[in-house]
Amino acid sequence: GFGCPFNQGACHRHCRSIRRRGGYCAGLFKQTCTCYR
């Protein structure tokens, strides 16, 4: 979701928009957008 697995930048922007420091694509096939604080 949120751009993953192909557009990690979209995931990162989504995470920034919910006041996280950023995000990356995680999981077996990089299909999950994971935010970090």
Swiss-Prot record:
Top-level lineage group: Eukaryota
Disulfide pattern: C4-C25, C11-C33, C15-C35
One Pfam family this sequence matches: Defensin_2
Protein family: Belongs to the invertebrate defensin family. Type 2 subfamily.
UniProt cross-references to InterPro entries, sorted A to Z: Defensin_invertebrate/fungal (IPR001542), Scorpion_toxin-like_sf (IPR036574)
Role noted for this protein: Dual-function peptide with antimicrobial and potassium channel-blocking activities. Shows inhibitory activity against Gram-positive bacteria. Does not act on bacteria by disrupting membranes. Also moderately inhibits Kv1.1/KCNA1, Kv1.2/KCNA2, and Kv1.3/KCNA3 potassium channels. Inhibits potassium channels by interacting with the pore region. Does not show hemolytic activity.
Gene3D superfamilies: Knottin, scorpion toxin-like
Any GO BP annotation: defense response to bacterium
Domain comment (free text): Has the structural arrangement of an alpha-helix connected to a beta-sheet by disulfide bonds (CSalpha/beta).
Example of a GO cellular component annotation carried by this entry: extracellular region
Subcellular localization(s) per the UniProt record: Secreted
Name of the protein: 4 kDa defensin
